[in-house]
Amino acid sequence: MQKPTRPQPKAGVLDIAAYVPGKEHVEGVAKVYKLSSNETPLGPSPHAREAYRHAGEKLELYPDGQALALRQAIAETQGLNISNILCGNGSDELLGLLCQTYLAPGDETIITEHGFAVYKIQTLAAGATPVTVKEKNERIDVDAILAGVTARTKIVFIANPANPTGTYLPFEEVRRLHAGLPQHVLLVLDAAYAEYVRRNDYEAGLELVSSNENVVMMRTFSKIHGLPGLRIGWIYAPLHIIDAMNRIRGPFNMNSAAIAAGAAAIRDRAHVEKSVAYNEKWLAWLTEEFTRLGLRVTPSVTNFLLIHFPDDAAHSADKADEWLSRRGYILRRVGGYGFPNALRMTVGPEEANRGVVAALTEFLK
């Protein structure tokens, strides 16, 4: 066997396909509207901006390793026990910590066919095997998940609402899923878009976490709170899970600006409600306009839409993406999520929303 001539990553790392974010720029186009990352067009709360500026006056100090001010704000506004809250440098870090804590080679996780790519990446990084199950009509299929559970299953990941479809699983179905899982299997409910949902049969997961030992709810400040640049995520979980994750968490994983701005953002309920109202107005308008153009739109409860294009080559999603990009509108290609002929569009500023509709009207002539 030939000796390696340089350090080698552990087995399996080079088999992982790196996450590919949405594009940010279009060559030769000066003015672009980035509608590919589900960022809020209203931006963060003014109070969060002020807290961020104030945090800049103390950069010589280490942040609070427990992120106490942020956890306190989350606990107070959500009616939760602060001891059951763990904050991280974005939900991605927390997903990684969960997988490092609970997965080993030979273990399996279950993800759905259109699920968030990071679930698979972090599963593989931990040396475990992701098992993909089918969805039904662009919705999570509880029966398919339960049928996929084996003696090796350790974690089940579901995004609710789901990305990139924008669909959701009613709480009774989530409850049925949990009831069908063995007690040692961890159910992770990724509720990144929960604040946008205004449906009586939806619940983000607080109730299940509070009454069980094997459920984790994950949330983010990157969507409705408008702070993706600061990377703030949090989980609500049983104490034994929080304790285990804290044992391998970095001692200062949250920076001071993120702690301060996040605490201010989640306390500003008026800004959240303003963002919800804006989104509901334009989500409905965009859905109606795209449908009028003859495009199928997956019904969404989030701040984005999955737009399906005709089968003819001249009007495919790839052609539409090229057409829109040349006009300064960046949408998200979702072929990697199992939708080769669809684009995902964030609800953006009014001028961008109207501009995309006008551009697609011309494209489809």
Curated annotation (Swiss-Prot):
Keywords: Amino-acid biosynthesis, Aminotransferase, Histidine biosynthesis, Pyridoxal phosphate, Transferase. It catalyses: L-histidinol phosphate + 2-oxoglutarate = 3-(imidazol-4-yl)-2-oxopropyl phosphate + L-glutamate. Pathway: Amino-acid biosynthesis; L-histidine biosynthesis; L-histidine from 5-phospho-alpha-D-ribose 1-diphosphate: step 7/9. The keyword Transferase applies. CDD domains: AAT_like (cd00609). Belongs to the class-II pyridoxal-phosphate-dependent aminotransferase family. Histidinol-phosphate aminotransferase subfamily. This is Histidinol-phosphate aminotransferase. It comes from Brucella melitensis biotype 1 (strain ATCC 23456 / CCUG 17765 / NCTC 10094 / 16M). The gene is hisC.
